[in-house]
Amino acid sequence: MRAMSKSLTILGIETSCDETAAAVLRYEDGRATLLSDVIRTQLAEHAPYLGVVPEIAARAHAELADLTVAAAMNASGLSYAELDGVAATAGPGLIGGVLVGLMTGKAIAQAAGKPFIPVNHLEGHALSPRLSEDCPFPYLLLLVSGGHCQFLDVRGLGDYRRLGSTIDDAVGEAFDKVAKLLGLGFPGGPAVEALARNGDPKAHDFPRPLLNRPGLDMSFAGLKTAVARASANAKSEAEKADICASFQAAICDVLAEKARRALEGFDAGAGDKRFVVAGGVASNKAIRAALETAATAQGARLIAPPLRHCTDNAAMIALAGAEHLAAGLCETDGLASSARPRWPLDEASAKADPVFGAGRRGAKA
């Protein structure tokens, strides 16, 4: 498909995990303007189970998808005829939810006679800072979420090279498991972060796995095991706070050191060195502060999306769809695309060097 230079208006749909989201975005001259941005969470549905239940998530998406899209279109003040395309997450993620959003998007595109753009959810996160920041390529990306933790060299749209990944648990997964061990409820990340503010980060000398090993690969399973041992005897809120603070400090140390190494070897070309952090865990203030320090020490600028766009959202999906459509990089027939529970962002290198155990839902990158 050839590139488009005119202003583009795109409907984006996101249903890969436990948020049902829709957004309408206008893209012109490389700049995005959000016309609507609707996110419906499923926290109440999953809280009793202390985690996301795929079947419950899929049913909730099926109930909410049409209503969420209608709300986004109404808020934008536009009709479907005024859209230039429809983008939806086609993976990776929980397959039941991905299917709901994908089929909803295809149906709207078919009925309105508009192009359909299947979007990689991870690419949505990778591009998310461009919703609100001037963030030209290339840049170093740390994608850190419940299912992923990886450093990527982002050279351009569709041009991604993995530099390092977790070899077992993702950071967000580790936060959720620590919260479960301490009985802090769901979602675990915000609960651990909140309690950590009242604790002593030096109370426990938790391991920093792979910290001194060359390269950018990470591991968090051993840290989680150490927390499990410490939490077995933790009864008071003060003891739990110390565990949370010490755990979070270990995470910060690992991410900051790996970021320092990544930035040290990153080729920014003739431009400024930019370090982007994206994904749900990017909303953690302690982690942001540690990464900011690492970036500054390497003469780089840390860029992160607003908190609303760190977690799953449809604005980033609409942006990815718009950028692909504008560049003429869309599939010839997006309606023929399939839902993909696994979809590495750097597909070529992932086939040559797959990462196993990259998150709670298996090796997706």
Swiss-Prot record:
Alphabetized Gene3D superfamilies for the sequence: 3.30.420.40
| Binding positions for Fe cation per the UniProt entry | 121, 125, 312
User: Which chemical reaction does it catalyze?
Assistant: L-threonylcarbamoyladenylate + adenosine(37) in tRNA = N(6)-L-threonylcarbamoyladenosine(37) in tRNA + AMP + H(+)
Per the record, a Pfam family?
TsaD
- Quote the record's binding site residues for substrate: 143-147, 176, 189, 284
Entry GO CC: cytoplasm
What keyword terms does UniProt attach to this protein? Acyltransferase, Cytoplasm, Iron, Metal-binding, Transferase, tRNA processing
Choose any GO biological process term that the UniProt entry carries and state it: tRNA threonylcarbamoyladenosine modification
This chain's function reads:
Required for the formation of a threonylcarbamoyl group on adenosine at position 37 (t(6)A37) in tRNAs that read codons beginning with adenine. Is involved in the transfer of the threonylcarbamoyl moiety of threonylcarbamoyl-AMP (TC-AMP) to the N6 group of A37, together with TsaE and TsaB. TsaD likely plays a direct catalytic role in this reaction.
Return the protein name. Answer: tRNA N6-adenosine threonylcarbamoyltransferase
